[in-house]
């Protein structure tokens, strides 16, 4: 399996876009490129029963974040909402494309440096 570099980085604010935790957001604390997963702070917490060892004399129950597949998260990037003059056209079930909170990531070269940009707005991150 070929290891691919992710466009997401550690400490990025991300939004879960699919799966059990859809709609929740948090900060990336670790990225596992081999398994293509990310660990997001306070999301997908699991408990594990741990036996006492020579290094850890205390046994018990530990909680920690488990990985979420990298395709289920997107960079959180708030864009300005559209102002609608016509109330009949502003239906609550239909959200305009610019009102979404997440974006894809692209790259652009500025001043001989590779910079991450938000595809939705074109601004650098």
From Swiss-Prot:
Gene3D superfamilies assigned: 2.30.30.30
InterPro entries, per database record: KOW, Rib_uL2_dom2, Ribosomal_uL24, Ribosomal_uL24_CS, Ribosomal_uL24_KOW, Translation_prot_SH3-like_sf
Keyword entries, A-Z: Ribonucleoprotein, Ribosomal protein, RNA-binding, rRNA-binding
Gene Ontology biological process: translation
Gene Ontology CC terms, in alphabetical order: ribonucleoprotein complex; ribosome
SUPFAM superfamilies given in the database record: Translation proteins SH3-like domain (SSF50104)
UniProt-listed NCBIfam families: rplX_bact
Family: Belongs to the universal ribosomal protein uL24 family.
Functional note: One of two assembly initiator proteins, it binds directly to the 5'-end of the 23S rRNA, where it nucleates assembly of the 50S subunit.
This protein's name: Large ribosomal subunit protein uL24
Originating organism: Mycoplasma mobile (strain ATCC 43663 / 163K / NCTC 11711)
Gene: rplX
